Regions:
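Zinc-coordinating Cys/His ligand positions in small cysteine/histidine-rich zinc-finger domains
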Residues: 170, 174
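Active-site-proximal cap/lid insertion segments
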Residues: 2-11, 16-167, 180-188
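Short, intrinsically disordered, charge-balanced linker/junction segments flanking boundaries
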Residues: 193, 197-205
Length: 205
């Protein structure tokens, strides 16, 4: 509804849409659970605590354990069972698929309105999440699993699909959008535009 109203205006628009999932608790409509065979879901490839690591870099999954409906409790001293780990990962995957479908609805509406080819789309997450990695179920660690987040951008008139592994930060999104929109970037920003990386992954932002 909001997109339809904005598309009728003569000025460029910016719409921010926030989705709560896949935040705890891991709940999603049944049809998204049914997309997966729980027995085929892989476990974490790095389930154990790295040797010699300072445990202050990790935690005992307090937020996760705070949800009383959980069947088991996670801790650094003992992993949850493989059966329960698969159940949890299944739930997380279902939440991701649910949100993926919601993002799809927005893109479908942009296409229906004829705005898709003139709209920059950013899918952005604020943190990663341990799914049993290093025995943690949650965020708030110093591990890459927690610190790395989702960032997907679709820029009009770009036919390339590029996967880029260079490091950027959330504070770089604003100056990037400003440059893409042809707007002067204010002085004194902490972030830097990474528009060059959108065209060539070998470039340095």
């Amino acid at each position: 509804k909001k997109l339809r109203a904005l598309s009728k205006g003569e000025k460029p628009f910016c719409l921010a849409v926030g989705f709560f999932k896949p935040h705890l608790p891991f709940t999603a409509p049944r049809k998204y659970w049914d997309l997966y065979d729980e027995n085929a879901i892989p476990l974490s490839p790095v389930p154990n605590i790295p040797e010699g690591i300072c445990r202050y870099a990790l935690h005992n999954s307090g937020e996760f354990n705070g949800y009383l409906e959980g069947d088991e409790r996670a801790s650094l001293d003992k992993s949850v069972s493989e059966v329960y780990a698969r159940k949890l990962r299944h739930a997380y995957f279902a939440c991701i698929s649910y949100i993926d479908a919601q993002v799809g609805k927005i893109i479908d509406e942009l296409e229906r309105l004829g705005e898709a080819d003139n709209t920059i789309i950013v899918v952005w997450g604020d943190h990663g999440w341990h799914l049993g990695d290093q025995r943690v179920w949650g965020k708030h660690t110093l591990m890459e699993t927690s610190l790395r987040s989702t960032l997907i951008m679709k820029v009009p008139h770009s036919s390339k699909s590029i996967e880029n592994h260079r490091i950027v930060s959330s504070i770089d999104i604003y100056p990037t959008l400003m440059e893409l929109c042809g707007v002067s970037v204010p002085d004194g920003l902490d972030g830097h535009s990474f528009t060059k990386l959108l065209a060539d992954p070998k470039e340095r932002s």
